[in-house]
Structure formats: structure tokens, C-alpha cells
From Swiss-Prot:
The keyword tRNA-binding does not apply. The gene is ZBED5. GO terms for molecular function: DNA binding; zinc ion binding. Zn(2+) binds at residues 133, 136, 153, 158. It comes from the Eukaryota. The lineage of its organism: Eukaryota, Metazoa, Chordata, Craniata, Vertebrata. SUPFAM superfamilies: Ribonuclease H-like. PROSITE patterns: ZF_BED (PS50808). InterPro entries: RNaseH-like_sf, Znf_BED. A zinc finger (BED-type) spans 109-165. This is Zinc finger BED domain-containing protein 5. It holds the Pfam family zf-BED. Keywords: Metal-binding, Zinc, Zinc-finger. May be derived from an ancient transposon that has lost its ability to translocate.
Amino acid sequence: MIAHLLCILSYNFNTSVILNVYSKLTMFCTTNTLPMDLLLKQGSLKQEVESFCYQIVSESNDQKVGILQSENEQLQPSVSKKSEGELSRVKFMSSSNKITTFSKKPKRRKYDESYLSFGFTYFGNRDAPHAQCVLCKKILSNSSLAPSKLRRHLETKHAAYKDKDISFFKQHLDSPENNKPPTPKIVNTDNESATEASYNVSYHIALSGEAHTIGELLIKPCAKDVVMRMFDEQYSKKIDAVQLSNSTVARRIKDLAADIEEELVCRLKICDGFSLQLDESADVSGLAVLLVFVRYRFNKSIEEDLLLCESLQSNATGEEIFNCINSFMQKHEIEWEKCVDVCSDASRAMDGKIAEAVTLIKYVAPESTSSHCLLYRHALAVKIMPTSLKNVLDQAVQIINYIKARPHQSRLLKILCEEMGAQHTALLLNTEVRWLSRGKVLVRLFELRRELLVFMDSAFRLSDCLTNSSWLLRLAYLADIFTKLNEVNLSMQGKNVTVFTVFDKMSSLLRKLEFWASSVEEENFDCFPTLSDFLTEINSTVDKDICSAIVQHLRGLRSTLLKYFPVTNDNNTWVRNPFTVTVKPASLVARDYESLIDLTSDSQVKQNFSELSLNDFWSSLIQEYPSIARRAVRVLLPFATMHLCETGFSYYAATKTKYRKRLDAAPHMRIRLSNITPNIKRICDKKTQKHCSH
């Protein structure tokens, strides 16, 4: 009770008065030997407290004279079953016997018009206003309505305007910008933030191709540990609200993929045209998987994206492939008439007869053309070679397989290479499917020839090849030529590769082949570094039969490439460089050629041509020169290679492994192979329930 009384007095009296009351009450309680309950029953404590309060009030000069009033049930012990000693709050009564409660009221500052000279107006209620700077719109508390504080804000935050008069700030205040009502700031709730964070983490899980369980088992604990160490345990507990369970991540990934698909469909509906690239393969569970990529113009660039990833339930025939693609197009109301080209690998299920996919697509899209992957043409062309070189290649593969097929032999070879200080410790496995690695395989075999000579058992029938200089000369040449061919092949891969890019690379290769053949005829082998270094090492020359075989191979390779990549009179060369055109191309009508003349006469367009890629250059001219630019984009849309499908199947195999055979990989492929970033804010706004725990 004493503490309760002192608390009430602290609102109305200074510290000295409170200390005086406390000392007198303490002395009274210590001098009386009776229990506290008895004092309350007798009323002694009540009388003593009243006496102290009368004395305090009389000594103070406050106009509010009060007497301590308390009802019997407040100061006397209750006779009911309630706990004894329970006291209600103490009230002061004024001299007119009206109940009043003494409390400190906060001081409210008023706004004065002179404060505008410091650049401040008022904001909110006129009786209790806040100070608002007319320059930076910052709102200060009511306590800041003091000239010194307002002047300090002006001099520190807006020193350039500290010498301005009040008319300047009045003009700034009356501007339309300042008359706009302040936009309320929308603050996300914890559930909204946790949901958005869950979508962000799920997006990165899908991009990495990891299992869904990694969110709850690894990412979430690591995030909590980092936040706890860097900030505080209180903040780390908020991470518990981010749901990353297996089922939650799976749902999030499906939502993200659906948002990307929705955006892609909207783009295809408004584009002028698109081209397709499709391929089919089997996954780890034995399902036939169809990948279809699309190339289209969007804004001022040509984009490439995954159109669909579907599992074929029965036979992977051309009809079923077409039905799968056609169902997607009809479901999303995408017009087949916009399809300008279909690129395939020319397999039996993809191209050929009317029952197959490409022919059926051309039937529903009469303006569409079909093309064969140019990389496969190149791969077919390089397989042809003279018998002497073919035998060396086959024997080299047999030597490699003799080592790689026996793990024990591979381990022993590694130990030997380490002891001999070799640069490499293992051979590379050669496969017919991975024809791009053939150059690296042969180079590695040639570099480890000394170690293999020591390692090889004399009983192995091909061990003598490593001591035959003629055999090694042919091997060195094959290592060089396949390395060069692989470099050309890799340069034709990647995104936004056009037919012009591929034919430019092939034209360069054809000229190089003729140059290499002429150099070999003159016994100049500088074009082949491995062969040239080996000749210097053994201090020897190349026999005429070897030179003849090399020249025959180079010339035969050139003629085969000409067969697969014939030189034609292309009427679309104006697309490659419109500024070199002096005569009307046959593929253009008079109106388009006039537009081309206007385009090539524009100096700004000429500058953009040197700065932008070919795809971006023509896409950027759609608004200014729509007719000729659309014709150029239509020429650039067709795919030249199957690079996207090959890359897509590699990602698919890495995502759907033997440990995740039941996984629906389509949403993961949509996220991983798409250039479109999902709009997570839009996805969360569609959710009626912001936070789902499982």
C-alpha cells in the first residue's frame, strides 16, 4: 500500500515531499508492534496516512487541496473469499468533494506561420500538429516545433537554401507537387514477407536443380545460424516463419513455373512470328520426354525460351509429338499461322512423312519452313577420312579403352604418371556420341605416349604402335585437325545463333581447309602445332605417303562440307549488312526496297548497326521502319542448331536422377531453361492465404 501511495504522489509532488512521506510511514510501521492486519482493522494506518496527506497538502502551495478518501473495502480487509490485503486504487478528492485524478499532460506545441521562414509547414491536426519540411517532405514530431530545431534541420539538410526568404518557401509550398496528399506506406506483414521469402528460396532451389528437401534440411538452418551470429537470436527466430518443407517447395516451384508460362504465352500472342526447335529423348525412368523451344521477338530483342516440356505416354511417334504441341497451342490460343520455321534433328520421329510432327506442323502452318540442325551436318561431314588415318583413329580408341575399361589399370597408370611427373594422370574416355571431345581425347593420348609406353604390357598387341614414328605422326595430325574442327563447332553453339553465323563459320573453315592442304603439299606443318612440335622433337620429316593421306583428308573434308553446306545465291544478304546493298534484292518488293534506302540513309541507324548485334539491330527498327524490319526479323527467327535442346536434356538428366525418378521435372525445366524471371509479388498477391505451413 505504501508503494501504491508513493506512486500516486509522484505524479503531483516533488522528490523531497515523497521522501518525507516515505520516511514517516516507515517510522510508523516500525514503531508499532501490532500486525499489519490488525492495524488495518483498527483504522490506525488509515488515520496516519490521512494525517500525513493533510500535512503534505497544507505544506504545498498547490491550489488543488485534497484529502485522502478511501472506501472501507479498500483499506479494510475483505470479509469475502478474496485475498486479504487487496487494495483498490487511491483517489484524491478536491475541496468540492468531486473526484479528480492528478496526471501530467504532455506539452503540445502550436504551429506558427513564422516557421515557414525555416522551410516548415504543419502536418496533421492543427491543435497538435507535426512539422513537415516543404523541401524534403520529412515529417518531424510535435516536439520539434521550435525555431532552433527547425533552423538546425534547414542548415544541416538544406544548407543551400538557408539564406532564402519566406517567399521562396511559400512558393515551394504552393506548388502542385506539395499539394498532393501523402501516399501511405504499405508495410508487409510478417506472413507476407515470409511467403515472399519462401518463393525466393524455392526459385533458387529450382534453378540449382537440387532436391526440395534441401530448403528445410540445409538452407533454413544455415540462414538461422548466419542471422544469429551476425545480428541477434531474436531476428533468427523470424526465419522459422519461412516455410521450406518438401511439399511447400514443390507447390512454390509449380506456382513460379505457371507464372513464367503465363508471361510467355502473353508474349507469343502479341509477337509477329516465332520459330520452333524440338527434340525427344528418354529419361531415367524410361519416359519419352519432349522438349520444344521457341524463338520470338519481344520489345527490342529476339528472345529464346522453353515452350513446353512434356512426357509422351505411349509411342514417341510424329503424330503424338504433334498432338502434344498442338494441344498446348490450342489451350493457350496461340496461332499456328505465326510459326515461320521448325528445326529438328531429322530423326525418324521428327521429320520425313506426313504422319510425323514436322510435316503436320507445316500442314497447319503453311507459311512455315523446316530446317535440319547444322551441327549434325558438320558432325557427319568430319567422319569421312582415308583408310590409313581411320585405322590410326580406331587403334587409338582401342588403346584408351584398354586402360579405361579396367579400374585397376587406371589406378596404376595414375601412380606411374605422378612418379614420372606427367602433366596429366589419366586418359579421357572416347565415345561415338560425344564427338565434340574427340580432339581432347587424342591430344591427351599423344601427351601421355611416354608414360603409356612404360606402362603397356608387351603382350598387348597395340603396344608397338607407341614406338612407331609413322603411327605417332598420323596420331599427332588427327589430334590437331579434330581440335580445330571442335573449335569451329563450339563457335556455332550458344544462344541467338543465326543461319548467317553458321554459314560464316563454315565459309571460314572451307577457306582454311584449302590453305592447310596447300601448306602440307609444300611440307609446311606450322598450321598443326602438335605435329610440328613432334617433328622437331624427333628431328625428322614426314613421309610422302603420310603427306598424301593428310592432303587427301583435307580436300575430301572440304568437298564433303560443300555438299552439306552448299554455296547458294542468298537473296537475304541485305539482312546481314543493309549498308552494302546497291541493287534491289529479288526477295524485296519496291516498297520494301524504298524503306531499305531510307534506313541506310539514316546516320543514326548506321551508328546503331555497328554497336548492336544483328538480332537487336533489326528488332529495334520495328517502330520506325516496320515493313522492312519485320521481313528481316522473319529471316533471323529460324534456329540454326539444336543447342538449346541438347542443353535442356543435360539439365533434365541432372535434375531427374535415379534417386528422384518420381519427380515431375517439367516445372523445374520451365524455371531453369527460361529467360523470364517470375513475378513473385504478383504470385503472392493472388494468394488468399498468405502463409501456408505445409
